[in-house]
Every structure is written in structure tokens, then in C-alpha cells.
A protein has these predicted regions:
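Solvent-exposed loop/linker segments at secondary-structure transitions
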Residues: 13, 32, 36, 46, ...
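Active-site-proximal beta-strand/loop segments in catalytic clefts of secreted hydrolases
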Residues: 23-27, 50-53, 70-73, 159, ...
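Gly/Ser/Thr-rich active-site loops/lids in small-molecule metabolic enzymes
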Residues: 1-4, 74, 193-199
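Short acidic, glycine-rich surface-loop motifs adjacent to enzyme active sites
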Residues: 5-31
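Soluble non-cytosolic domains of exported or imported proteins
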Residues: 2-3, 28-29, 73, 146-153
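Conserved beta-sheet core of the metallophosphoesterase superfamily
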Residues: 30-84
Length: 200
């Protein structure tokens, strides 16, 4: 990755870029290796990365670009402010948690409602109830990727009972397949299944 990143940085430098940053989806260790390119390319200021799914920051210095990663499912973001002046470029960043304390922008809500309506036109059963959870089912990433969870157990039970002839004795599923990263409570809907198997 480092060699390819340096080729791209050199191209941006040749094009006269005022600032260069990386947008990646790599392991933190790989991002840190790429960040060291700042030593030879001082216009390379920061990397915004993904992959780990947890908020992370590796602070840079004169020879290393900053590396910032937000949480999965847009639960945390980094606000990055860049100031250009005759004296150079200044970059500052702030971690922002996206939670109930932030009001939903009405203009955004109109757009979200429009697209949800289009989804329901294409898949009218998406909001349909397929079951009921008397106990909240834990589909959070921290649970399904680190041990047994009742949501993972529920999914595996559905898989096992789907095979009747011959009957399956057991079923298991890789926790990384379960992408909902949330609790499922009360009505279980097709939407919950769609959010769980986001890549299907």
C-alpha cells in the first residue's frame, strides 16, 4: 500500500495540490505506515480511515500524518477543519459523537423519508413483522464478534430449523456476518434481517 500511496501523493504534488490527505479502508498499522510518508511529502497532512469499526486516532507529528477513524454505522465522526494562509496550512480535528443530543436536520429528514418511501415501494414487506422478541436480542458488534449472543443464537436457530429433511443437528454463523450493530426488541421485522445481513 505504501508504494502505491506514494505514487499517488507524488502525482498530486506534481499537479500543484495545496494539501493532500488519504481516504482509506485499511488496518490501523497499514495507515500508520502510509502516514510516515509525510516525512518525504510534507503536504500529506492526514488520513481518514475505516476498517476497525472503533474510534481511533494516531496523532501525527512533523514526520507523520494524523490518522483518524470513526466508529462504524456513523456513530462517531471526525470534524476536520483546514485553514489555508500565506504561512502554510493548519489542520485541526474534533471527534463528534452522533447521538440523540443532535437534532435531525428537517431537510435531511425529507430526503430520508423520500428514499425510505422508494424502498418500501420496491420491498413493501420490509417493515412487516416476522416475529416478536420478549427479551431484547443483542446484535451489537461488540457482542456478536466477541462471544455468544442471543441475536446470533436466534439467527443460528432459524438456520438449523430451515433444514428438515434431513434435519440439521447444529448451525453456526460467523459473528462478522451479523451487521446490525444494535438491539432488536419487540417486533422483529424484515428490516432487522436486512440490517443484519447487509451484504446479502
Amino acid at each position: 500500500y505504501v508504494q502505491k500511496a506514494e505514487q499517488i501523493i507524488e502525482q498530486f504534488e506534481a499537479d500543484g495540490a495545496d494539501l493532500i490527505f488519504g481516504l482509506t479502508h485499511l488496518h490501523l498499522a497499514s495507515d500508520i505506515e502510509i502516514a510516515k510518508l509525510k516525512r518525504r511529502h510534507p503536504m500529506f497532512k492526514f488520513i481518514v480511515g475505516g476498517h476497525e469499526h472503533e474510534v481511533q486516532r494516531h496523532s501525527g507529528d512533523a514526520n507523520t500524518a494524523d490518522v483518524m477513524k470513526g466508529a462504524s454505522n456513523a456513530r462517531t465522526i471526525w470534524q476536520i477543519d483546514v485553514t489555508f494562509s500565506a504561512g502554510g496550512t493548519e489542520v485541526s480535528s474534533q471527534q463528534i459523537d452522533i447521538d440523540q443530543s443532535i437534532a435531525i436536520d428537517p431537510e435531511y429528514q425529507v430526503i430520508a423519508d423520500k428514499w425510505r418511501g422508494k424502498l418500501l415501494e420496491l420491498v413493501p414487506f420490509f417493515a412487516s413483522r416476522i416475529g416478536y422478541a420478549a427479551t431484547p436480542l443483542d446484535g451489537r458488534e461488540a457482542s456478536v464478534r466477541n462471544g455468544d449472543s442471543n441475536w446470533g443464537g436466534f439467527i443460528a436457530d432459524q438456520m438449523r430449523t430451515a433444514f428438515r429433511d434431513p434435519p440439521a443437528d447444529l448451525a453456526f454463523i460467523n459473528g462478522g456476518t451479523l451487521r446490525i450493530d444494535d438491539f432488536v426488541a419487540d417486533d422483529i421485522t424484515f428490516e432487522d434481517i436486512g440490517r443484519t445481513f447487509g451484504f446479502s
